[in-house]
């Protein structure tokens, strides 16, 4: 099992969480689909549930919430990028055309976080680890394996993430329009335009990919549990993948990748 025990390097996707309209139903869905274990957490943390796989943190699930009198945020997955200093990240985000949606805040002794949007509108989080580094297992069936930025303007996004958060875009030979996102010499994610298989008008967003043993059987399981198939299973260079939507509307991808192609960490 690819276990992570050291803090993630700044800019690296380190955690994901889901804002759900029905937290318990979401916990049940992902337990049945991926084998996650989790329960609604303490009230002092808003009931936030840290789900585990093999006893290690894999993702968070929380109930929809927002400022009083404001519309609730959409049901969606949020990718968090690691940072050594959330307050410095806030300044860098604002200074490079991003928008800080929630100012840096402490999460007990676990860490310090903020939520922001890049200049193309994609929402993401920033996590400054203290006692909690983020995902403790990756690249294992049921765990996070890839994070992809689908954006209406790859140029604007690329110009933002490198100076703001240390994510450097690079072209990939033979994959026109698709870019790797790199921290130092390590690829930690990807970036592309909004895929045609998504609904017209879909805003820019980060999409998580989960590793699976069998893409087709997982897609069948999603459908049986009242989810929706957005992009049916298909083969690509890095494996067999599909894009689906859970019963509450959160979109994510699953991929069955050859073991030799799995990275050590996301």
What are these model-predicted stretches?
Residues 2-3, 8-10, 14-56, 95, ...:
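Core segments of cupin and vicinal oxygen chelate
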Residues 155, 161-264:
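Structured core of small recognition/catalytic domains
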Residues 36-72, 118-119, 123-130, 168-203, ...:
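Conserved short beta-strand elements that form part of the metal-binding/catalytic scaffold
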Residues 1-24, 76-79, 127-158, 170, ...:
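N-terminal beta-strand motif that seeds the catalytic metal site of vicinal oxygen chelate
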Residues 91-100, 220-225, 266:
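Short, positively charged
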Residues 12-21, 49-52, 67-92, 112-117, ...:
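Vicinal oxygen chelate
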Residues 87-131:
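Hydrophobic alpha-helical segments and helix pairs
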